[in-house]
């Protein structure tokens, strides 16, 4: 029993796993957040689902002609919407925010994507237009220090000519139910 051993608080936590692999001189990158107990708390589920929503909406923006800068600009609005739903931001504060210091950055302080290829964080200009056959990550996160946890999810995508990108990690579990099932099997 983890509580009787003084580990009750640890039992409520999550583990954020950011891993990569190399094959044929090319790199990969993936992040998942999993509950130590095998079950997410109700609050963790809400935050996890918000991060997954941001990832899924951002995926639709990873298309030919956009740039990483475009993705970062658009994800600010998507993230802000989710943070309002979670009660972390208030609409009245958003209306008065400094555009050079958006409020969502308190909870999501890194970029949404990076190039991937010969290196995990491969070299590439954020202004360069995205072209078919380029490979990028999408990695939103929400980090809530006051609540003692955060969630980040990351997959790798191949940009296509005339369609949405291909998630190269689509067979790796990411949905809440999938993660809990694996953790409890």
Where in this protein do the model-derived segments appear?
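Charged, cofactor-coupling segments
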Residues: 14-56, 112-185
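A short glycine-/small-residue-rich loop at the edge of a beta-strand within enzyme catalytic domains
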Residues: 35-38, 42-49, 62-70, 103, ...
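Short beta-strand/loop turn elements enriched in aromatics
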Residues: 95-123
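Extended C-terminal subregions enriched in glycine
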Residues: 47-90
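Single conserved hydrophobic/aromatic residue that forms the stacking wall/gate
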Residues: 1-11
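Short glycine/threonine-rich loop-to-helix capping motif typified by GTGT followed
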Residues: 5, 82-86, 124-125
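A glycine-biased, small/acidic residue-tolerant capping/turn segment at secondary-structure junctions
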Residues: 88-95, 151-153
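Active/binding-pocket-proximal capping segment
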Residues: 73-80, 92-96, 134-136, 174
């Amino acid at each position: 029993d983890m509580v009787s051993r003084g580990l009750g608080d640890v039992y409520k936590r999550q583990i954020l796993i950011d891993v990569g692999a190399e094959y044929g001189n090319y790199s990969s990158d993936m992040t998942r957040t999993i509950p130590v107990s095998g079950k997410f708390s109700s609050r963790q589920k809400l935050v996890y689902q918000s991060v997954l929503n941001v990832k899924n909406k951002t995926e639709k923006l990873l298309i030919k002609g956009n740039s990483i800068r475009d993705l970062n600009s658009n994800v600010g609005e998507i993230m802000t919407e989710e943070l309002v739903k979670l009660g972390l931001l208030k609409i009245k504060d958003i209306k008065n925010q400094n555009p050079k210091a958006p409020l969502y950055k308190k909870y999501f302080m890194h970029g949404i994507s990076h190039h991937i290829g010969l290196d995990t964080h491969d070299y590439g200009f954020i202004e360069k237009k995205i072209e078919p056959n380029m490979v990028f990550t999408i990695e939103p996160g929400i980090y809530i220090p006051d609540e003692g946890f955060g969630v980040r999810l990351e997959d790798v995508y191949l940009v296509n000519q005339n369609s949405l990108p291909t998630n190269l990690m689509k067979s790796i579990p990411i949905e809440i139910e999938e993660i809990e099932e694996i953790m409890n099997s």
